[in-house]
Design a protein with these regions (language model features):
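A conserved ligand/cofactor-binding region detector
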Residues: 1-212
């Protein structure tokens, strides 16, 4: 008898989709940006764009350990990220419109570009939803490779902030309320500094949520 299959419906930044697809022991069913109407996609990233949860400084290798912390610097960084989103929307809308503003409406050269291409310009700012299914062995491998490694004063590593705090406070069965009360600020830079995991930070954030 095989392992019980475990399914998770997860929403995460589109930028880490390719990394998730490398996990062959898990089957994936993903929403496609090509199937979503262009105007709906534009509205989505205007109202709920993906913005990085933290901003690593330039580094060598696969994973950095230093983060931008200055408030003014962070504000400028986020503002520029959103300007890049706005520029992507503007260019995608030009392609989708067939350049009506520049060509006469009676001009037979007006041809609108397919949404399958226009939506591609918006993907860095998109979220995607995926149904992920696999046996316990597949999930164990996923957690081993992708979960954070929060190091505590004891030297022991934990796969989630909840586990680390529960061990520190002697809580044997922490629930969701414990999570919310114990680290309300998900973006506290000290957690990133304590994390010695080597996966991309948004990949680790997703793995941590599923682990919890």
């Amino acid at each position: 008898q095989g392992d019980e299959l475990i399914s998770v419906l997860a929403t995460f930044p589109r930028i880490i989709l390719s990394e998730i697809n490398t996990h062959r022991m898990l089957s994936k069913n993903t929403s496609s940006s090509r199937a979503i109407p262009f105007n709906k996609m534009v509205d989505t990233i205007k109202n709920d764009p993906f913005i990085p949860i933290a901003w690593q400084k330039e580094h060598k290798g696969m994973q950095g350990s230093e983060y931008i912390k200055d408030i003014d610097h962070l504000k400028i960084t986020i503002d520029d990220w959103l300007k890049a989103r706005d520029n992507s929307i503007e260019q995608a809308e030009r392609l989708s419109s067939g350049f009506e503003d520049e060509l006469s409406e009676t001009d037979d050269r007006i041809d609108k570009v397919t949404k399958q291409l226009c939506n591609r310009l918006l993907e860095p700012f998109m979220w995607t939803t995926m149904l992920i299914t696999g046996p316990k062995s597949g999930w164990d491998n996923f957690f081993h490779l992708r979960c954070p490694q929060y190091e505590t004063n004891s030297g022991k590593g934990f796969r989630s902030r909840k586990d680390a705090l529960a061990a520190q406070l002697g809580v044997k069965d922490p629930g969701k309320d414990f999570v919310k009360e114990s680290y309300e600020d998900d973006f506290n830079i000290e957690w990133f500094k304590a994390n010695k995991g080597q996966a991309e930070i948004h990949m680790m954030a997703l793995a941590e949520c599923i682990w919890d």
